[in-house]
Amino acid sequence: MKVIFMGTPEFAVPALKKLITHHEVKAVFAQQPKAKGRGLNLAKSPIHQLAFEHQIPVYTPSTLRNDKTINLINKINADIIVVIAYGFIVPKAILEAKKYGCLNIHPSDLPRHRGAAPLQRTIIEGDRKSSVCIMRMDAGLDTGDILMKEDFDLEERTTLEELHNKCANLGAELLIKTLANIDNIVPIKQSSDGVTYAHKLTKEEGKINWYESAYKIDCKIRGMNPWPGAYFSYNDKIIKILEAEYLNAEHHFTSGTVISDKLEIACGSGILRVKKLQQESKKALNIEEFLRGTNILKDTILK
């Protein structure tokens, strides 16, 4: 099958690799190179780099909402468009430009976690089950019909990185199965029940509320690493907690109280045992290294 691929980050790489192996990728659309590092040199996105290595034409328009880009896509001889974490809204003219329309890999149990941050919200909400869906895109926000879906269980303390990698690889496999059977698949409309929205994360959301349960705070730590990071303030410094574990232990302390010299913190319910931290503008440290340089005393109440 002749494919136009639209994507940008690492999450989309396994799918593009599979498409290159099994189909004919006619063109790739990715976001424009961005300045990175101290030298602010322009760096290609992971998808742009992969397409470049395979000598596939790459286009990096600043928007899809103009006649020039729409006309370009219309001229490319392709049967289908695959869109994965591209970063731009796809207008109706492009959704309907090819015979089989536009397909999308969405890493959640739709209609739960529609939107920009399904992986993060899955972890933050403490979900123990999730899915990867192959969806035929329509004009709504992740409201299209489901062509193929695979459910799976999450371990209790699954990290964002683990979920990201699982969904990226599973999605790539499902995409190839979908394309192989696309003429025989009966699309399934999404339920109108159980709709939730996985809104884009904000930096402010990362601030830890010690009155929440230790379990909920642990979910936030795992779901917000690396960005924006779950953090607290100490001596006017922002400190991110990168790794912790929760203890379902009763206590009589005020929430936010440091109850041991190993940075165990009383929460609304339970205790959070911190294992890895990062102070702003400094490198990440395990708890022993951190406490050698920053002495947070027992009985301190964190904000």
Curated annotation (Swiss-Prot):
- Describe the reaction catalysed, as an equation: L-methionyl-tRNA(fMet) + (6R)-10-formyltetrahydrofolate = N-formyl-L-methionyl-tRNA(fMet) + (6S)-5,6,7,8-tetrahydrofolate + H(+)
One Pfam family name is Formyl_trans_C
The family database entries (InterPro entries) matched by this protein are listed as:
Fmt, Formyl_trans_C, Formyl_transf_N, Formyl_transf_N_sf, Formyl_transferase-like_C_sf, Met-tRNA-FMT_C, Met-tRNA-FMT_N
Any idea which GO molecular function terms this record carries?
A: methionyl-tRNA formyltransferase activity
Q: List the disulfide bonds.
A: none
Gene Ontology, cellular component aspect: cytosol
> What's the name of the protein?
Methionyl-tRNA formyltransferase
